[in-house]
Amino acid sequence: MSTHRALIENQPLKRLGLALLLAFGGASGVQAQSLQELYDAARAFDAIYLAAAALADSAQYKAAQADALARPSVGLGLTGSHQRSDIPSGMTVNSDLLQAGLTAKYAVFNRGNALTISQAQRSLGAARTDLEAAEQDLIVRVAQAYFDVLAAKDALSTTRASKAAIAEQLASAKRNFEVGTATITDTREAQARFDLATAAEIGADNDLRIKGVTLDQLVGRVGVLPKPLAVPVALPAVMPVNVEPWVSQADQQHPSIRKARLGLEVAQLETSKARAAEGVTVDLTGTLGAQHLQNSLSGQAATTSGAGNTKNASLGISLNYPLYTGGATQNRIMETLALEEKSRNDVDFARRSVSEGTRRAFFGVQSLTAQVRALEAAESSSKLALEATQLGYKVGVRVNLDVLNAQTQLFTTQRDLAKARYDVVVNGLKLRQAAGQLNPADVAAVNQLLAK
C-alpha cells in the first residue's frame, strides 16, 4: 500500500508547475503584447473613443463660429432687371437696370454676442472633459479586457493542473483497489472529481476564448497574447493611504464634475444673455453701391435711348432698444433661471455621485489588497496542508478523499490569488479614474509590472 501511495507524493505541485509552463510557454513562438502596445492600438481603433475625439474636434469649430460675432460681416450683392412698358401713344419703353452693392456691419456694442462667445468657450471646455472621460474609460476597458484574458489563462492552467493531479490520484486509487489495499469508494471519489475537473476545464477554455475575443475586438487585432505580470509580483501601493484626499482630488478633477460646473456657468450666462435682450445694441453699418440704367424709347417713327451711371456710399450707426416684447423677454429670463437651478442641482448630483464612487473604489482596492495578502498566506498553508495530507495518506492515517480535498483547496487558492492580483491592478486604475486622475502615464506605470 505504501509503495503505491508513494507514487502520488508531491505530484500535484509538480504537475501544476508543468501545466503552467505549458500554458505560457506553448505560445513562445508568438510575440506577446504589452498593455501599452494594446492601449495605443485601441486609441486608433475603438469606435467609442474615436467618436468622442471627433465630437471634441467639432466643438472647437463651433466655438470659432461664436467668435465670428465679434468681427465685422461683409456682403456683396448684384442684381439685374429688365422692364418693358407699352404706352397708349404706341411707344414702348425698355429699361435695363444693373446694380452692385457692398454692405458691411459691425456690432459696436452687443452684450448678447459677448455672452454667446463666453458660452461657446465653456461649451468647448465641456467637450474636452468628455474626451478626457472617454480616454479614461478606454484605459479602464483595455486594462480590464487585458487582465481578464490573463485571469482566464491562469484559471485554465490551474484547472488543467488540478485535473492532472486528480488523474494521478485516480490512477493510484485504481492500483490500490486492484491489489486490495483500498476500497472501490476511493476510486469512485477520484473518478467523480476527475469528471468535475473535465467539465471545469471545458468551461475555463471557453471563458478564455470569450475573453480573448473581447480583447481582440477592442484593440482591432486577432489572437492577442497579453504579457503576464512579472514574477515575483510587486503590486503598487495605494497612495494616499486615506480616502479623504482621494475624494478631495475627485471633487476638483473629475471630468463629470468639471463638465457640470461648466454647464452651470453656461446656464448663468444664458440668464445674463436673456437680461441683455432688454438692453441697447449698437451696430456700425456701411454700404457702397453702383448702378447702371439704360432706357430706350421706340415707336413707329424712331427709336431713342439713354444711359446713366450712379454711385452711392453710406456710413451709419444703428441703435436698437426694445420697448415692448409682449412679455417674451421676462418669460425667457424666468425660464433661464429655472434652467440655472437645474444645472446647479446637476453639479450637486455629480459631486455626490463621484464622492460615492471614489469611496467605493478606494475601499475596494483596500479590500482586494488585503485579500491578496490573505490568499498568499493561504497558498503557503495550502501547500503545507497538501504535503501533510499526502504524507498521512502514505502512512495510512488519511483517506483518498482528504488528498482530493487538499488538492482542490490548493488549486482554488492559486486561481483566486492570481485573479485577486489582477483585480488590484485594474481597480487601482478605476480608483484613479474615480478621482479624475487617470491618464496615459498610468498605463505606462502598469506596463512596468509586466514581464519583459
Language model regions located:
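Gram-negative bacterial Sec-dependent N-terminal signal peptides
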Residues: 2-31
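A glycine-/polar-enriched beta->alpha junction
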Residues: 40-50, 57-72, 101-119, 128-136, ...
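Periplasmic alpha-helical coiled-coil/stalk elements that build and connect Gram-negative outer-membrane
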Residues: 2-3, 14, 137-249, 361-364, ...
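Amphipathic alpha-helical coiled-coil scaffold segments and their short linker/junction regions
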Residues: 39-46, 187, 221-296, 303-306, ...
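Cleaved targeting-peptide boundary
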Residues: 30-40
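Metallo-beta-lactamase
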Residues: 204, 255, 420
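Amphipathic alpha-helical coiled-coil segments
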Residues: 51-66, 134, 138-157, 168, ...
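Small/polar, glycine/serine/threonine/aspartate-rich low-complexity segments that form flexible
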Residues: 77-108, 230-240, 272-273, 285-332, ...
